[in-house]
Amino acid sequence: MFFNRLSAGKLLVPLSVVLYALFVVILPLQNSFHSSNVLVRGADDVENYGTVIGIDLGTTYSCVAVMKNGKTEILANEQGNRITPSYVAFTDDERLIGDAAKNQVAANPQNTIFDIKRLIGLKYNDRSVQKDIKHLPFNVVNKDGKPAVEVSVKGEKKVFTPEEISGMILGKMKQIAEDYLGTKVTHAVVTVPAYFNDAQRQATKDAGTIAGLNVLRIVNEPTAAAIAYGLDKSDKEHQIIVYDLGGGTFDVSLLSIENGVFEVQATSGDTHLGGEDFDYKIVRQLIKAFKKKHGIDVSDNNKALAKLKREAEKAKRALSSQMSTRIEIDSFVDGIDLSETLTRAKFEELNLDLFKKTLKPVEKVLQDSGLEKKDVDDIVLVGGSTRIPKVQQLLESYFDGKKASKGINPDEAVAYGAAVQAGVLSGEEGVEDIVLLDVNALTLGIETTGGVMTPLIKRNTAIPTKKSQIFSTAVDNQPTVMIKVYEGERAMSKDNNLLGKFELTGIPPAPRGVPQIEVTFALDANGILKVSATDKGTGKSESITITNDKGRLTQEEIDRMVEEAEKFASEDASIKAKVESRNKLENYAHSLKNQVNGDLGEKLEEEDKETLLDAANDVLEWLDDNFETAIAEDFDEKFESLSKVAYPITSKLYGGADGSGAADYDDEDEDDDGDYFEHDEL
């Protein structure tokens, strides 16, 4: 291939054209390293990462798992749920993540962030981003060409990038793991859709950094699910379709599994198709029905839409196991109740076009891998949306009646597989024989003369991989060449995604076709790309690891976000301390009152009884006046003051003292007294 300088800039021209005229011998390099991210554990290969966790960072729900002593555990959050909503909310008092955030969305739609995975790593002007903004109740703004969310934090407008919001969700997963393990966690394996491009993968790694996690691997979700599925399979080779229909993304992968070796043969999918799209169809139907009945259009009412979205998701789940469901919302709008019946048949009718749309990527992976339907041994269902009966029916019908395997929990399979990969990296027992070969999802190449896309690494090539090729100039005495790096499957570079560009300068004057410029693409196990160009005559080299040209975060931005994440964590800790101190004081005061008015009061002198009641009432009145404004130390001081009043009196009954111990009151006494009166409320 040759570089060509045009008036519009320096481009590339195929070498064969100049070769024919100049008889220049070009030697393409064939050193493609088909080494994969091999998960074979050797004694010298494992670094001491401590416990490495596996995280499925989902569009609607996230899940965290860990492998300990050869056993993989899916970890439950503080609500006891094994999957956590990928929601972050901001109130005037605190930041909420997970179930707590999702539960208050109807009352606080503009400050409750969800579906952030649909925005991460993309440009603000991307068609998909603009389409999503129309459906999101919170404000999405343009920040340096990238989407960001604007919320009100303590009365002030604050802007968060998708990486920051995702970092908060990853931080929640980290906390769940640390609560379970009782130790700090610093390393993780995080999954992404197979069709995520380079920018989206790097943005996900940045989110991990913001959360205080070193993301050791970015793993394709279907690949992780295949690990979960394949651990107990037989030794003979299996061809498996992994059909992953989640909340916001859809992926299909064709994998072969043999003797513990996983190889991704082909991947396809849609980054904007999932359960939430099915929910929106229900929401639109409910809006239409409500308008017809009551003449009120709620399509621009964010609070009403949040209520509809919540009920639509419930209805969708119910219809996977029953033929109809009732959707009822009291005082939906203007005091008017909403009451509608949705049948499974109507739900299927509303979404049939989307259900059928999922079969297109299935066809594509079969074409790409050169297999026929009959060659597929197993169909694996992943993602909560695969519970929909019509989805299963259409897929099984496409494969001529072959039944889909339902042996793994579709919500947990991806996190399970991520934890197995994490276990390999941390040196866990029981995974020595697992090998994983992953592939790149999109073709990578450079622009040549005429705007042609010239591939170097074709899609579905096993990674990590490294490919090099010799190019040359197409203009006499050309001193500079421009390398434009693209990803995509289109023939013309303008129809593909520009990853980045750089110049190689200082090429000595020479006739066209004489300089030899070696361009090397190195794609690592996370799908992160480094491109270099070397003038073989002078040895001069330039390179790029695709970063800001793709709208990624700068190190300064990451550092700032890490600092802000730590600040939020500190604020969260302060709020938690305040709430605990406040509850401790309130419980203590009420406990004193109840006991004085109960059995304890019968044993007290009237003066002591009055002293305790007055002290407790004073504290409760103070709490009413200062409930929100006081800080943890204020509550602790009040607790100590009340304890000093109560201790001399209660010690007469329980300690046999004469009351003179008040002057000798110390922290130990406070703890003992506090233990007596303070209990968790049921």
UniProtKB/Swiss-Prot annotation:
Region: Nucleotide-binding (NBD), residue numbers: 146-300
Motif Prevents secretion from ER, residue range(s) on this chain: 679-682
Matching InterPro entries: ATPase_NBD, BIP_NBD, Heat_shock_70_CS, HSP70_C_sf, HSP70_peptide-bd_sf, Hsp_70_fam
Binding site for ATP: 58-61, 117, 247-249, 313-320, 384-387
This protein's UniProt keywords: ATP-binding, Chaperone, Endoplasmic reticulum, Hydrolase, Nucleotide-binding, Signal, Stress response
Molecular function per GO: ATP binding; ATP hydrolysis activity; ATP-dependent protein folding chaperone; heat shock protein binding; protein folding chaperone; protein-transporting ATPase activity; unfolded protein binding
Major localisation: endoplasmic reticulum
Enzyme class (EC, first level): hydrolase
EC numbers for this chain: 3.6.4.10
Region (Substrate-binding (SBD)): 420-520
Organism domain of life: Eukaryota
Coiled coil: none
Acidic residues composition-biased segments: 664-675
GO cellular component term, pick one: membrane
Residues making up the signal peptide according to the UniProt record: 1-42
Reaction equations catalysed: ATP + H2O = ADP + phosphate + H(+)
A biological process from GO: ERAD pathway
UniProt function note: Probably plays a role in facilitating the assembly of multimeric protein complexes inside the ER. Is required for secretory polypeptide translocation. May physically associate with SEC63 protein in the endoplasmic reticulum and this interaction may be regulated by ATP hydrolysis.
Family note: Belongs to the heat shock protein 70 family.
Designated name of the protein: Endoplasmic reticulum chaperone BiP
Native source organism of the sequence: Saccharomyces cerevisiae (strain ATCC 204508 / S288c) (Baker's yeast)
